[in-house]
Design a protein with these regions (language model features):
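Acidic, low-complexity glycine/serine/threonine-rich segments
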Residues: 1-62
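C-terminal extracytoplasmic interaction modules
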Residues: 6, 61-108
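Extended, beta-strand-rich, solvent-exposed assembly scaffolds of outer structural proteins
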Residues: 7-15, 19-24, 89-155
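C-terminal, active-site-flanking charged/polar segments
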Residues: 39-43, 49-54, 129-169
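Short conserved micro-motifs at the rims of enzyme active sites and ligand-binding pockets
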Residues: 60, 171-172
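Conserved small/polar residues in nucleotide/adenosyl-binding loops
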Residues: 173-180
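Gly/Pro- and small hydrophobic-enriched strand-loop and loop-to-helix capping segments
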Residues: 183
């Protein structure tokens, strides 16, 4: 069943999004998933938008990442303790052996942190900004020394993932299925 649903999402992406002016319609995707098999009575699908950037290694660079969609932030300080709505893949910075990550504080600040026994330890609470209205993320003077593997494979990019404010976000070019649970 899982592979059938992933195939449905892939087909939706190919037929609806990867053509000129293709628009993502959440309700249509949900219906397509429900129609995949008679055993599916309904589904809860959460959308996230991901952008990748290729860092300039061993240089303090300001990065601008444009999601081109409004981002979910219903109130100032939303989800601060859990890391806001921004998440990143790992990387190392100059002067540290720790694997670093990015998140946000729900107030427009991008934070740089590493994990100690699973607990976030913030190294810089103002590594950049996130504009929830425009979807622009700015990372200021970030000096990346290396990029971590992603999904067990070598990578040359840092992935940034956010929650859109609307399920019918406009700027999707393709969809990828990502399961968070096997049920």
């Amino acid at each position: 069943l899982k592979s059938l649903v992933i195939n449905t999402i892939t087909n939706y992406s190919t037929s609806k999004l990867q053509k000129f002016e293709g628009l993502f319609r959440y309700s249509q995707l949900i219906q397509d998933i429900d129609d995949t098999d008679t055993s599916i009575l309904s589904n809860i699908t959460t959308l996230k938008i991901r952008k990748d950037f290729t860092p300039t290694i061993d240089s303090a660079v300001t990065y601008q990442v444009y999601f081109r969609n409004a981002l979910y932030n219903p109130h100032s300080g939303h989800n601060t303790d859990m890391g806001g709505i921004l998440e990143s893949s790992g990387f190392k910075i100059q002067g540290s052996d720790e694997e670093m990550f990015l998140n946000d504080d729900g107030q427009g600040n991008v934070r740089l942190y590493y994990l100690v026994s699973g607990v976030k330890t913030y190294q810089n609470n103002t590594q950049g900004t996130i504009n929830y209205t425009t979807g622009q993320v700015t990372l200021t003077s970030l000096n990346i020394a290396s990029v971590s593997n992603i999904g067990g494979s070598a990578s040359t990019v840092v992935e940034l993932t956010v929650n859109p404010s609307s399920n019918d976000a406009v700027s999707y070019t393709h969809l990828r299925a990502h399961e968070t649970a096997d049920n």
